[in-house]
């Protein structure tokens, strides 16, 4: 029979549990609060009764000092008359302070120590009682010294008289005052816990804060008076101007209606609360527009009256230079306002263009851009910046119908035009884009807006990206999204390898499209999709099976678009040199039909960076603010970018035209980018393509890719020269499994490369040939 363990011998038997301790403490706290409430209910009436008895005290009432049967006038009755008489005879006028002192001390004692942690810092009840008694003694003594009267009850009472007489006999009047004052301060500290030094410090801070406050008030008053004088002066000028305008002929200024960005169906769906969380009707790969910040209400630009005044001022400024013009229209936008002027006969456009800086100085604005030709009109445009510039949010562009109705998966939301309408562009029609501008002009923000535009339009099955970021700051935030072909490239040697892989991929796609009989990537994907829907998928015409592995032809898969982002093209040109320029030129010349597109950005728009070879193959360009007309001509082949305002203000040169369009780029915050990136990371795992950044690159059939992107030979990449051969050999000998899928999974490489590694091991005698069931035996001993 098992021996029963006594309660004392059990571990922690004598220790209360945490739950029990909490229960006991909570019970005690509840009892303490209940007791405090009861004491407060009892003390409050007593103090009120005592105060009322003191205020209604009468000498004629019978009490301690006077007996009789007269009528009691005290509101507290006989007891109140007795108590008031005793207190006045004993303490004098200090009797009025006694209920107040008792009330203050009681309140501090009851409500000053709710938390147990503060219990040790509060005074004990005995000390509080000593403080109250000391307060009565000190107060009665002070009252007796300074309010001495023949009637004892009118001064400090009997107590004050006895205290002062005793102290004066030994210390005199001066010493008695000091002693009584010291006793008063100590008593107040004991009774209430008040720190006199802390009180003096607070008073000092208040006193020191008074002079700055007075100075600030005086300064505000002066500013208000100055503003009032300015308002009165403006009123006088306005009256004079109104009289002058009344004498002139009225001018017509055509103001277009305020553009309204119509929301797309996708934007309306994203604003609705889904029935099931995590469900996206357009596919879980596309992020929701709710991840972006909503546009905020902003102050508009010029008012109608200001536009009329500016129109008159423009005409007067041109008259100063002996040029007659007439303002016939004004078109306010979110950032600038375009005034359309009609010059007089015989006035050349070059005369007006040469006066852009003089007009800007005369109008007191930062810059003025002259639009020499406006299609469809015989007027000249004069673009003047608004006083209040509106911020354009990317969410407003992506919610527009212009962006949503664009059928292309490569739709870029660039910003808004001068009229406030969304401007979108199709990268597939460009087919490549060159972005240039000085530091701080908004170039990097625009690149981020382009990236997000693509991410909100196409999933990782339809679009893959290769990002090259020499500065390691702008594009590295997109690390880990499923759209990337490889990790964000920061090493320029790896950048050259990535571009070389893209050239080889372009050549491979052209071979596929030629074998299938289509002219572009859209036709190829359509033909593959139609074949799959018909139940007869197309086989890969470039597939070369290995007879030893018993491989079968693979069906063709849909090919995604590839967009290559290079954030700082000039740095890469300086490090790598001509080799990169040749690779980019090859991609720019031929990659359009293969679905590979380039977006190049640089902050150094010089001729040694933006070479003639690159400009000839990239006709679509965006120029942000630059420092000189020479830089503007380097980018756009014409001036104008030097007059931009910065912060996203750009000139967009569409493909097939020589007339740049002014666009105000959208702002993208870092928080928005991080939210979208986190959503994409959670929606799908990273799917890097093997070998994109390798120094030795091979195609699926084992052909080595040369420095120019062309295949060189068919002898490399499948034997011991593979850089991953030693690692694969170690995995096989350690795990004792010669499985292609195991090597593929452990090394994160493609199936064909893993199969070539296993085949190389078979040639070297590490593994046996495949048996009838496909298994291989590991012949080499395990590593020691």
Curated annotation (Swiss-Prot):
Positions of transmembrane segments: 38-58, 68-88, 92-112, 129-149, 178-198
Compartment annotation: Cell inner membrane
GO-annotated cellular components: plasma membrane
Keyword Lyase belongs to the record: no
An individual GO BP term: chromosome segregation
Positions contributing to ATP binding: 440-445
Residue ranges of every copy of the FtsK domain listed in the record: 420-633
UniProt signal peptide: none
Alphabetized SUPFAM superfamilies for the sequence: P-loop containing nucleoside triphosphate hydrolases, Winged helix' DNA-binding domain
Topology in the lipid bilayer: Multi-pass membrane protein
Superkingdom of the source species: Bacteria
Main location: membrane
InterPro entries: AAA+_ATPase, FtsK/SpoIIIE/SftA, FtsK_4TM, FtsK_alpha, FtsK_dom, Ftsk_gamma, P-loop_NTPase, WH-like_DNA-bd_sf
Keyword vocabulary terms for this entry: ATP-binding, Cell cycle, Cell division, Cell inner membrane, Cell membrane, Chromosome partition, DNA-binding, Membrane, Nucleotide-binding, Transmembrane, Transmembrane helix
Annotated Gene3D superfamilies: 3.30.980.40, P-loop containing nucleotide triphosphate hydrolases, Winged helix-like DNA-binding domain superfamily/Winged helix DNA-binding domain
GO molecular function: ATP binding; ATP hydrolysis activity; DNA binding
Cytoplasmic topological intervals: 199-784
Similarity comment text for this entry: Belongs to the FtsK/SpoIIIE/SftA family.
PANTHER family attached to this UniProt entry: DNA TRANSLOCASE FTSK, SPORULATION PROTEIN RELATED
Record's function text: Essential cell division protein that coordinates cell division and chromosome segregation. The N-terminus is involved in assembly of the cell-division machinery. The C-terminus functions as a DNA motor that moves dsDNA in an ATP-dependent manner towards the dif recombination site, which is located within the replication terminus region. Translocation stops specifically at Xer-dif sites, where FtsK interacts with the Xer recombinase, allowing activation of chromosome unlinking by recombination. FtsK orienting polar sequences (KOPS) guide the direction of DNA translocation.
Description of its domains: Consists of an N-terminal domain, which is sufficient for the localization to the septal ring and is required for cell division, followed by a linker domain, and a C-terminal domain, which forms the translocation motor involved in chromosome segregation. The C-terminal domain can be further subdivided into alpha, beta and gamma subdomains. The alpha and beta subdomains multimerise to produce a hexameric ring, contain the nucleotide binding motif and form the DNA pump.
Binding partners and assembly: Homohexamer. Forms a ring that surrounds DNA.
Protein name: DNA translocase FtsK
């Amino acid at each position: 029979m098992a021996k029963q363990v006594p309660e004392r011998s059990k571990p922690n038997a004598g220790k209360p549990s945490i739950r029990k301790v909490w229960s006991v403490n909570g019970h005690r706290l509840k009892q303490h609060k209940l007791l405090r409430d009861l004491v407060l209910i009892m003390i409050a009436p007593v103090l009120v009764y005592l105060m009322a008895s003191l205020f209604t005290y009468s000498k004629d009432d019978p009490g301690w000092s006077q007996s009789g049967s007269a009528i009691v006038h005290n509101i507290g009755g006989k007891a109140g008359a007795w108590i008031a008489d005793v207190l006045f005879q004993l303490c004098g006028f200090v009797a009025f302070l006694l209920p107040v002192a008792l009330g203050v001390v009681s309140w501090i004692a009851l409500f000053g120590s709710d938390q147990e942690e503060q219990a040790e810092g509060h005074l004990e009840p005995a000390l509080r009682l000593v403080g109250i008694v000391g307060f009565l003694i000190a107060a009665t003594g002070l009252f007796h010294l300074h309010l001495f009267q023949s009637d004892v009850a009118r001064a400090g009472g009997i107590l004050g008289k006895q205290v002062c007489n005793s102290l004066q006999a030994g210390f005199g009047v001066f010493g008695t005052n000091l002693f009584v004052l010291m006793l008063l301060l100590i008593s107040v500290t004991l009774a209430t816990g008040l720190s006199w030094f802390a009180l003096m410090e607070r008073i000092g801070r208040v006193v020191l804060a008074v002079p700055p406050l007075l100075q600030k008030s005086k300064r505000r008053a002066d500013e208000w008076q100055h503003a009032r004088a300015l308002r009165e002066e403006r009123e006088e000028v306005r009256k004079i101007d109104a009289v002058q305008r009344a004498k002139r002929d009225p001018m017509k200024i055509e103001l277009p209606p305020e553009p309204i960005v119509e929301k797309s169906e996708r934007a309306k769906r994203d604003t609705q609360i889904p029935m099931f969380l995590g469900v996206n009707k357009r596919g879980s790969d596309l992020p929701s527009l709710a991840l972006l910040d909503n546009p905020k209400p902003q102050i508009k630009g010029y008012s109608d009256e200001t536009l009329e005044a500016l129109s008159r001022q423009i005409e007067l400024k041109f008259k100063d230079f002996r040029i007659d013009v007439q303002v016939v229209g004004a078109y306010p936008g979110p950032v600038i306002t375009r005034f359309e002027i009609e010059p007089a006969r015989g006035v050349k456009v070059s005369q007006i263009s040469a006066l852009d800086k003089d007009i800007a100085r005369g109008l007191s604005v930062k810059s003025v851009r002259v639009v020499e030709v406006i299609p469809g009109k015989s007027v000249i445009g004069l673009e003047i910046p608004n006083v209040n510039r509106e911020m354009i949010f990317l969410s407003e562009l992506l919610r527009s119908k212009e962006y949503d109705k664009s059928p292309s998966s490569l739709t870029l939301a660039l910003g808004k035009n001068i009229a406030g309408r969304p401007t979108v562009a199709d990268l597939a029609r460009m087919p490549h884009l060159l972005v240039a501008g000085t530091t701080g002009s908004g170039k990097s923000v625009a690149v981020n807006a382009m990236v997000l535009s693509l991410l909100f339009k196409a999933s990782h099955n339809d679009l893959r990206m290769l990002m090259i970021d020499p500065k390691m700051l702008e594009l590295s935030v997109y690390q880990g999204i499923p759209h990337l072909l490889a990790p964000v490239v920061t090493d320029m040697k790896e950048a050259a390898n990535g571009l070389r892989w893209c050239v080889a991929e372009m050549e491979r796609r052209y071979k596929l499209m030629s074998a299938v009989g289509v002219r572009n990537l859209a036709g190829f994907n359509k033909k593959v999709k139609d074949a799959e829907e018909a139940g007869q998928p197309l086989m890969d015409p470039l597939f070369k099976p290995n007879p030893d592995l018993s491989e079968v032809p693979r069906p063709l898969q849909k090919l995604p678009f590839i967009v290559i982002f290079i954030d700082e093209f000039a740095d890469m040109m300086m490090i790598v040199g001509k080799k990169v320029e040749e690779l980019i030129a090859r991609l720019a010349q031929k990659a359009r039909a293969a679905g590979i597109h380039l977006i190049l950005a640089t902050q150094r728009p010089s001729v040694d960076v933006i070479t003639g070879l690159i400009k000839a193959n990239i006709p679509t360009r965006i120029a942000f603010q630059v420092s000189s007309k020479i830089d503007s001509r380097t980018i756009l082949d014409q001036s104008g970018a030097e007059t931009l305002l910065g912060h996203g203000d750009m000139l967009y040169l569409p493909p097939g035209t020589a007339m740049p369009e002014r666009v105000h780029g959208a702002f993208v915050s870092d928080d928005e980018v991080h939210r979208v990136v986190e959503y994409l990371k959670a929606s799908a795992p990273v799917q890097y393509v093997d070998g994109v950044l390798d120094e030795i690159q091979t195609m699926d059939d084992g052909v080595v890719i040369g420095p120019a992107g062309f295949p060189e030979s068919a002898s490399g990449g499948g034997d011991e020269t593979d850089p991953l051969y030693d690692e694969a050999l170690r995995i096989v000998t350690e795990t004792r499994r010669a499985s292609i899928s195991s090597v593929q999974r452990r090394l994160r490489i493609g199936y064909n490369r893993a199969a070539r590694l296993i085949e190389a091991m078979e040639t070297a005698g590490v593994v046996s040939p495949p048996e009838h069931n496909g298994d291989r035996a590991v012949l080499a001993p395990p590593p020691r």
